[in-house]
């Protein structure tokens, strides 16, 4: 995939991964209470995207040197970090072990 993806494309990718690549593994990632972790995470993606948009807006409104949203998204390391931190937060809330820490450390090492 090149360029940006939207929520519909992400959902299509998830369905592909569920059905084609991980058909045996996917159902195995359920918690004892029956919550399917990938489904629970992907259900939060629109909210993560909304929050990231508010992060972009905050930079745009508070940095007079920024001409538009595109510059914030493409050139600010903050955005790279916030995407990882927001996803890690959702995973942590779902009780996923290790991966949230890995995501935050990845963002930390790059920013």
Label each PLM-derived region with a short phrase:
Residues 1-105:
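Terminal amphipathic alpha-helical/low-complexity segments used for targeting or macromolecular assembly
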Residues 107-111:
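Structural signal for interior beta-strand "rungs" in well-ordered beta-sheet cores
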């Amino acid at each position: 995939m090149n360029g940006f993806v939207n929520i519909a494309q992400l959902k299509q990718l998830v369905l592909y991964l569920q059905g084609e690549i991980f058909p045996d593994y996917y159902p195995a990632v359920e918690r004892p209470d029956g919550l399917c972790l990938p489904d629970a995470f992907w259900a939060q993606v629109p909210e993560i995207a909304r929050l990231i948009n508010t992060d972009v807006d905050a930079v745009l409104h508070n940095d007079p040197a920024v001409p538009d949203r595109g510059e914030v998204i493409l050139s600010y390391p903050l955005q790279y970090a916030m995407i990882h931190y927001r996803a890690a937060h959702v995973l942590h809330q779902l009780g996923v072990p290790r991966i949230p820490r890995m995501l935050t450390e990845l963002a930390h090492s790059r920013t």
